[in-house]
Amino acid sequence: MPVSVITTVLACLWLSYRLYKFLTIPVSSIVSTLKIKTPPATKVSIDKIATDSVTIHWENEPVKAEDNGSADRNFISHYLLYLNNTQLAIFPNNPNSLYTCCSITGLEAETQYQLDFITINNKGFINKLPSIYCMTKAREANEALKTRKWRRNTITSSTAMQPRNSKSEPAPLPSHYSSVSLSTFSSNITNSATSNNGSNLPAYTSLTTLKDLDSFSIDDLKKILICAQEDLHDVLSQQTSLLQDFQESKLELELELDNLKTHWSHEIDLRKSLKSNIKSLENSKLLTDLKIEKLNKKIDKSKEKISKMRNDMQKWSQEDTELLSKDTIKEKYFKLLNESNASVANINKEIESLQNEISKMEESNKRLNASKKSLITSIVVNANVENDKPIASGELSAVLKKLNDFTLEKNGFLSNAGEEFLSKLNADSSLIKMIKQELSIDQELEANWKLQRSNLLKKISALENQFNEMSLNNRNLKTKLMVQPYKNNGDSLAATNSNNSAEKNRSSGSIQLPLSNNMSRTGSIDLISNNNKSINNSNADSAPPLRLHNPVSYSPSNEPIQPSSSLLSQLTQDTDNRSMLSNHISSNNENKQQPSSYSHALPTTATANATATATATNGHSRSNLWTTAQFAQPSHQQVSTELDQAFEYDNANHLISGLQNMIYDETDYPDNISNYSKGFTTDELDNYWTKQQPQVRSTNESLFSTTGTPMSSYKANPVISPYSSSHLRQTSNATNTNPMHPQSLLAATLNDPSLQSFVRSGSFYSAPQPANSLQNNINGNETENISPRISSDFNLLVPNLSPRLSNDVPIVPGNNTTLTPSHSNILTMNHQPTADNITRRSFHASSPPFNSIWNSNTNQLSPPLEEQYHLDVPVGPKVPAKEPSPKPSHKRNQSNSSISSAWSKFKHKSASSPANADTDIQDSSTPSTSPSGRRMSKLLSKSGMNNLFNPHSHDS
């Protein structure tokens, strides 16, 4: 029982809650969920509100057509108009008209009314906008006068005129507001007149003249005047009211006209918009028509294609049914099977026949191979027998002659025809074996030569160190001697001449002494150092006066004087180290130490420093010859690239003039030749030095510092520099009238008494002997005075001073370390004197490309010896030289494994003497030779000559 009650209560609560929720559902949500199509709401516009009427209008809804052509079923069917919740009228929807107007009349003034407008569709659904509230206008007081109707005059008949003597007063006129009263008023007057006077008063409107008033009494006139005044006031009031009505109606009409104008403009705009819409619709219609036509065409084409495809599919289905039948497939299969079996049988038959042929061919090949092996063995045996036989001399000479013809003379290469001929030779022939043997011999000789060269380079480095030490000692001693003042004696010239003659005798006597075999270069250097120390001690103790040599007292070039051992060792040391020294010894102080008077006249080649003779006070005959020769060497780059070549000259005193003439003949690169070398000969230079006036310079300028490295001290030492001799000459000439005669290094070396025996005895450059050419080629006169040990050491240290064959020999300083004995016999000399006493040289080469010596190619520069063998030699600044334009050159293949290079070496050995074959191998690591295969002297090369005559002031 309680459970049922509880459930009933819960059910009632649930139902009430659901009812509440259902009632609170908005109508819009219900309409949207049920998808009810309600009619659209129509807006009502109020046009005019009057005191008793209201005018409204609204737009009619046009009927919309659906896609299927039928009319829309949800269009508005009619409208309902309510006034104060009271239905006034039902207006149907007229889609043909745009607006519907309605005027509600019979309303009260100043009363508020509620207007409701409801739209209903054909299904009965309604839609309503919010209600419209409006109030009518108030009614005015003089509204009765504001009428367009004129009030007529109510007095239609004239009243009877009373006589003047009548005493009865007329009755007062009633008001004009009421015609009835007026008409009553008239009827009363008439009755009183008839009753009183028995006649009616005329109307005052008929009284138009004054004569008409004569019959009336004053009272009557008063009454008429009052009535006229009342009428006049009435007319005036009507006039004012009419004017007001006119103004109001005018304003209303103007406003209405403005409204109509705006309405008309709206109508025009609407028409324009409608026209534009119509045009756009027409255009869209045309576009849609075109699209429809295109689509119809596409549809027609697609239909045609579909029909064709259907027909094709039907045909294919028929063909498939015909072709895929089992009977036809079986027939085709059996046909193909029979054909394949027949082809297989034919192929098997062909294979069997081919196998039989192959077996026959293999048997025949085996027989042929056996016969071939037997023939090869017999041929090899015969060839070995023939190769073991020595080649006939005639055949060998013919082969060598052909190869010699095919060899190029300039570079030793084989031509293409020669390489083809060499490749055709049998590799097992005795000629090839002989060539290989010669190559092995050449390689062994080359290895020995390299070993000897490395030993010589080590010796040269040791000698350079000794030279540096000696130069330091020499410089210290010279500074002490140079600082001492010179004594001005009257017999300086005679003393100098006597000293020179005594010096000649002493030098000739000392050079003729036998030399011991154990004497070495170090011994001679020690001898010079001991002499220097003795002179230093004597100068420190006694400080004897110094006398400079007279150039006239120098020994002539044709007088034979034997060199002493000390000078010989000094010369060998100076000759070995000259090639290793740089030209920076004298290049840095040229412009600083050169006087202004010699700025353009002083030659920049090389000058001999002052030669001083120290004479002891005790009258001893012992003297020491101090000779320091400085030579402007070319840069290391030029020294390393140019190779030495031996030449012979008939007169060494005119070497510079000969070089100058050769420079004039060389016109390939005239820009590289200095202008200073175009105006001087040897005689002119000698005359210049003898005629030059001395210039007095203070002794303080000759002082110099003795500190620094041995090689760098040359730069700061004015005495050792090439121009220091001129300063020394000027200082000495301040007290001595005998001028100095400085010479170049070449002339000073040739005029040195210690070298006269070498100058007069024969040539330094001659052909080597078959045996030890460096030690056993000394003439009989030399072997009597010089021991074999000294001669061998001298030849090793000075390779240019080889045994002599000719009469007049120049000493050519050069890169002596790269000269090989095999090239010493390349050139010979013919002596041809000229009219101007300057000897011209005509060089006769042993091969056609002799002129290429003067056109050496300097494009491929090899490193200097110091860089190649890592020698610790002080190197000065390199003077940049102008590189000539490149000329076509032939690069030789220096590989020992090359057939052409090996054959060229063999060819050179076979063409020269047997002794040359042992010494003709060149080091592949050494600088390359000239295009003609010959080495040139560094002094006689083009760059050497340019550096000889080129002023150093231009290189700075």
From Swiss-Prot:
Q: Does the keyword Cell division apply?
A: no
The segments labelled Disordered in the record are 152-173, 488-600, 875-956
Record's compositionally biased regions (Polar residues): 153-165, 488-523, 552-563, 578-599
Residues modified as Phosphoserine are S501, S520, S802, S842, S895
Q: Where is the composition biased (Low complexity)?
A: 524-543, 564-574, 895-904
GO CC field: cell periphery; endoplasmic reticulum
Give the keywords, sorted.
Answer: Phosphoprotein
Domain Fibronectin type-III per the UniProt entry, residue ranges:
40-141
**Residue(s) carrying Phosphothreonine:** T154
Instruction: Kindly list any coiled-coil regions of this protein.
Output: none
Mention any additional remark.
Present with 149 molecules/cell in log phase SD medium.
Task: Tell me the protein's name.
Answer: Uncharacterized protein YEL043W
